[in-house]
Amino acid sequence: MDLKVSIRSHTAGEVSNFVNKLIAGELEEAAALLDKIPQQDFHMYYTRDLSRAKEYCRGKYDHQPEKRYGMIVSSKAPGLSKLGMPRATWGYKAKYYPDGSGRRWKVAPWFNEKSNHPDSCCALEVAITEFDCQGLEIDMPIVGWGEDAKWINDHWEFMGTDDEKISYRINCYRVLLTRGRDGFIVFIPEGRDDVAEVFERVHIEKLPELE
C-alpha cells in the first residue's frame, strides 16, 4: 500500500508512552506524560458529539487536500455502527459498504484516494477497525470508544473471557490511539461518563470550536 507520506510521527515515542500508561490505567503517570507533549505538535481531544468531530476535521483540513482524517473503531464494538460509525460488512470473500448499495469496499482506497473521493477516509462514511489500520497512519483519526472497554472501580475492564482475549482488546485500543500524525479525537458516546471522566483526569481536552 502506497500512502505517499511517512507513517512515522515526530512525536510517536511520547504519544506511545502516554497511550501505554492510559491503557494500563496508570492515570497519574499518563497525565504527567501528556503534559510534556507539545500541544502545538500533537492535538488530543475528546467529544461526546460525533458530528462536531467530523465538522472539526473538515474545517481544519479544508485547504490541505493532502491531509487524511477518518473514523476508526474496535472490531468488538458493534454498537458504534448505530451511532454514526458503521463498518464495512462482510459478504462472500469481500466487504461491502454498509448502506446496502452492494458497492464493494476496499481498504486501499480508504487510505489513498483524494480527500474529495467518495471512497476516501475523508468522506467519513465507513469506519475501519484495528485490523485494517495496524501499522498505518492518517493525520487525524476519529476514534470511537466502544462498549468493549469500560472504566469500573478505578481500573479498565476489557471485554473477554480469558487473558488472551483481554490482551487483544488492550492491544486494539493501543493501536487505535496511535494512528494519528497530527493528533486524535476520541468520540465517547452518551452514557459513557466513566470514560469521559478518565480523559479529564489525564488532561485530554474537550474538542474546541474551530477558529
Where do the language-model regions lie?
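Accessory C-terminal helicase-associated subdomains
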Residues: 37-133, 181-185, 193-198
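Short, flexible loop/turn elements at secondary-structure junctions
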Residues: 5-7, 48, 73-77, 131, ...
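Generic detector of well-ordered alpha-helical segments enriched in charged/polar residues
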Residues: 4, 16-24, 31, 51-58, ...
